[in-house]
Amino acid sequence: MSRALSTLLLLSVLLPAVVGAREVRVEVRDPKGEPVADAVASLTPLEATPVVQPPAEPVSVVQEGEEFRPHVTAVVVGTRVTFPNRDAVQHHVFSVSRAKKFDLPLYRGEPREPVLFDQPGVVSLGCNIHDWMSAYIVVLATPYFARSGTDGAAVIGGIPPGRHRLEVWHPRARSALTREVVVAGGGAATQVIALTLGVDRRVRRAPDSAGGGYK
């Protein structure tokens, strides 16, 4: 996470915002109006406890080309995640995040067991061999979420009517944006968010990394 100042502003000034839809499209933009990818938008009901059902099969975060793919993954609490290594070299995946600490020593192919993510929060991933490899898993206690694509849009569907907490997170933002919205009916609605990101402080990839590392 960057220490640089990050400012998140909703273009709407009304709190709570009334959204006449059961589907919410969250459009994340930078101050110049350009789309922001890899933002996680979630809606948490405020009038009832959301029912969270983790998927039966593990979610995969792949190591390929000495990178984690995807860079940002959003899951619900209770999801198991596997970290297949498709590279010829070995990787050592780990996290020291409060929401999940784990360590997968040097391996190729499939690790023995998936990792269970049983607490909400943001989990930062790294590789002990390749310093530039980084990724994030956002663990949520709500089933209503989406990750923005290259167009900056995150579309959240199946939302029950009522008051919700909208939260938008990005790895280069100092903190997540939160606000209240009211989902009032059917159809679709759009929330536009202006997001200023801090400096990207990821370690640069080693120029001679291809084919290197531990065999």
How does the language model describe each region?
Residues 21-215:
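Extracytoplasmic copper-binding redox domains, predominantly the cupredoxin/blue-copper superfamily
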Residues 1-2:
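N-terminal secretory signal peptides that target proteins for export/translocation
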Residues 5-6, 25:
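Generic extreme N-terminus detector
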Residues 6-16:
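Bacterial N-terminal signal peptides
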